[in-house]
Amino acid sequence: MADFFAEWRGPLPTLTAAQIAVLDRLKQRYLIYADSGAITEGTVNLILLAPLLETLGLMDQPYQVRGEKYVRFELEDGDTTLEGLIDALLIAEQFWLIVIESKRYGFSVRQAIAQTLGYMVSAPQDRSFALITTGEDFLFVKCDRNMAQYGLSDKFTLTTAAGNELHTVAQILLQLVRLGAQRA
């Protein structure tokens, strides 16, 4: 179903010139770190993710960022329990806006889809969104428990020569947060 996750396609919010300048600096910062060696999840969170959320105004009220939120849930078969830590969770009034899962440099964002969907199933609402990132690559996920369906965005990367895809990532993130906040 092609229209299940159309929210990431647009129309998307417009970024300010100041936001674009910061996003360009964040891309360059990431590439410098990547060129100097392996980047851990913690480094991605410090040099890219936290500044991205700050630039978009998502670190202050009415939003809250929770780091390393523990989740535990049972699968419908009753025999399997999954548990783990969400790297970051953006919420507004107990409504999960975005689950953020970061992975180390060299890890494929696609490898984190199953883990991220597991976290999304434990969200307090039926529909949730997530962002998976290695710092270099970004993938958005939508999950709807009522429909037993999920969808993926295109993969966005900082290593493209065709501009700064972090701009698009920021726009999609703002769009999904706004949609989530409207439902809260």
Regions found by a protein language model. Give the residues of each.
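A short, conserved, highly charged catalytic patch centered on acidic carboxylates
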Residues: 1-127, 137-184
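Short hydrophobic alpha-helical segments used for membrane anchoring or interfacial signaling
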Residues: 132-134
